[in-house]
């Protein structure tokens, strides 16, 4: 694909030491691994408790490719989930901290952002506790609806259309 050719040229010219991709599914990652002389070191994807990304996570781990989460709190949708609220109360932390630490314990790099000082502070304090195996399982089981924030339909509403930016996921 054109994007892989451009990534390869950028690397060959010494303009990039490493290559990262975004929203790549397993087939796209395989293509990148087979086509590029240097494999991607990271794949940025939507990753939160309401979506099942276990297939891409396992594949990425098997290829030593880090996953980098965006929408880690599902644009606030997780704030409505009682399971996450109960875990947050038990640990005396916020619901976003629960979700971000869940991703961290799964080996995913979390990209979090906020303009509110309290939330920024919370984002820095996701490593001060540990989720139990049972809690990790409870959180992982929240993905039954497979709730996506970024969908082809939502991207097609953009001007210009950006639906091609969102692949059919695994």
Name every feature range the model reports, one short phrase each.
Residues 1-170:
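Beta/alpha (TIM)-barrel catalytic core signal, keyed to glycine-rich beta->alpha loops juxtaposed to Asp/Glu
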């Amino acid at each position: 694909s054109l994007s892989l050719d451009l990534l390869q040229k950028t690397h060959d010219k010494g303009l990039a030491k490493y290559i990262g991709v975004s929203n790549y599914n397993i087939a796209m990652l395989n293509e990148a691994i087979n086509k590029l002389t240097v494999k991607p070191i990271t794949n940025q994807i939507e990753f939160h408790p309401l979506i099942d990304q276990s297939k891409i996570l396992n594949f990425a781990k098997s290829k030593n490719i880090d996953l980098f989460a965006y929408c880690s709190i599902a644009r606030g949708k997780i704030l409505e989930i009682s399971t996450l609220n109960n875990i947050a109360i038990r640990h005396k932390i916020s619901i976003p901290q629960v979700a971000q630490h869940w991703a961290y314990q799964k080996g995913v790099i979390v990209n979090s952002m906020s303009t509110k000082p309290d939330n920024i502070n919370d984002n820095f304090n996701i490593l001060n506790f540990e989720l139990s195996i049972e809690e990790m399982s409870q959180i992982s089981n929240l993905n039954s609806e497979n709730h996506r924030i970024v969908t082809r339909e939502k991207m097609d509403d953009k001007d210009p259309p950006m639906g091609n930016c969102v692949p059919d996921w695994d």
